[in-house]
A protein has these predicted regions:
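A generic structural signal for short beta-strands and their flanking turns/coil linkers
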Residues: 27, 42, 54-58, 74-78, ...
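A generic local secondary-structure boundary/capping motif
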Residues: 20, 98, 148-151
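Structured helix-beta-strand junction loops
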Residues: 25-26, 74-75, 191, 206
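Short, structured beta-strand-loop surface elements
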Residues: 65-123
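Short beta-strand segments
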Residues: 25-64
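Residue-level recognition of well-ordered beta-strand positions that form the cores
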Residues: 45, 61, 81, 112, ...
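Short, basic/aromatic recognition patches
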Residues: 6-30
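C-terminal edge-of-domain segments
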Residues: 1-5, 118-207
Length: 207
């Protein structure tokens, strides 16, 4: 795939368990491919799984009206971008003069797409709905929906992406000494901003 993520070695994440958890917790992704000679992107939920060969895959679907749907038949290479928490880091939080920066977590997943049959697409929808209905007080199930409602499933293109490569980055002020690192965490926690606090928690886990 022609798009790559710039990752300084200090911020590279190669912990497979962490990456899998990150994808599971931040499943709303951007699916990118080449469509009609241009890069095309769609925001969709994707879930991590394994295929019958035991290989890791991402499962999802898009509308049949989306130009990407037709392009998958000609070009099976895709990129899924997963973004996590992020926050501004003020240089006023350091004990020395420096420039501000931004801390964040991100994962790029590269793979080859395979379109599902209608039967497979129903199974895919079940997995997606079951995952996100799990916290609902009255969870719905695909199996319980009427035939009329399920006709809408004919309007989607379901697929799985066999993962060929993963690039993961966690930029969490790893270049700072312990004193400044701890102060960044403290200042982030004072903001009462959910994103900032999430980054503070990630920093605590990282050192």
């Amino acid at each position: 795939f022609s798009i790559k993520m710039y990752i300084p070695n200090l911020y590279k994440n190669e912990n497979q368990a962490e990456i899998e958890q990150f994808i599971s917790e931040n499943g709303f992704a951007i699916l990118v491919n080449q469509t009609n000679g241009k890069h095309w992107a769609t925001h969709i939920p994707l879930i991590l799984g394994t295929n019958s060969d035991g290989k890791q895959i991402l499962i999802g679907h898009i509308s049949k009206l989306n130009p990407q749907a037709e392009s998958f038949k000609q070009n099976d290479e895709v990129l899924a971008i997963f973004s996590g928490s992020h926050s501004y880091i003020s240089s006023s939080w350091y004990d020395h003069e420096n420039v501000p920066t931004w801390n964040y977590l991100a994962v790029h997943v590269y793979g080859k797409i395979r379109l599902h049959s209608f039967e497979e697409s129903i199974e895919s929808l079940k997995k997606l709905v079951n995952k996100y209905e799990a916290k609902s007080e009255k969870p719905i199930r695909i199996e319980d929906l009427s035939e009329k409602t399920m006709r809408e499933a004919r309007g989607i293109v379901s697929f799985e992406i066999e993962i060929t490569n993963i690039e993961a980055q966690k930029k969490l002020s790893q270049n700072r000494d312990d004193k400044n690192y701890k102060n960044i965490i403290s200042e982030l926690e004072k903001t009462n901003d959910n994103q900032a606090i999430a980054i503070a928690n990630e920093m605590k886990k990282n050192r």
